[in-house]
Amino acid sequence: MHICILSGSTLGGAEYVAEHLNDVLETQGFSTALFHGPSLADIKNEKIWLVVTSTHGAGELPDNLKPLFDELAKNQSDFSDVRFAVVGLGNSDYDTFCYAADKVEQVLQEKSAVKICETLKIDVLNVDDQEGYAEAWLPNFIEGLK
């Protein structure tokens, strides 16, 4: 089974989590492709998306992921053959905590993509080991693939 991991990061935290999940999935026998800021053309044939994103500014997607989701929002295609899950990193001191993860989920569901498990929201204020926290959530994602 092939998994496309998309990371959107401003300061590197989401990128580190995405890379860690990529390594764990490969160790477990999955085929993966890791993209830091892909275009829609890069991933148009991918059917399983694991999106790992931080929230930037006032609840925005990071600059390296925003163009993809802007393009998706405007695209008229049906993405019902795409299954996805989202990992969001944010700071609960802000009222826009993990808004980027919510936006990703909203755009994908509007395009009929199928959410396979609950979104993981990591509060960087309270979770020191974000990679380990995401790894502990990973069985939920894998179960959703079945």
Regions found by a protein language model. Give the residues of each.
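Extreme N-terminal starter segment of soluble prokaryotic enzymes
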Residues: M1-C4
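A short beta-strand-loop structural module common to alpha/beta enzyme folds
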Residues: G29-S39
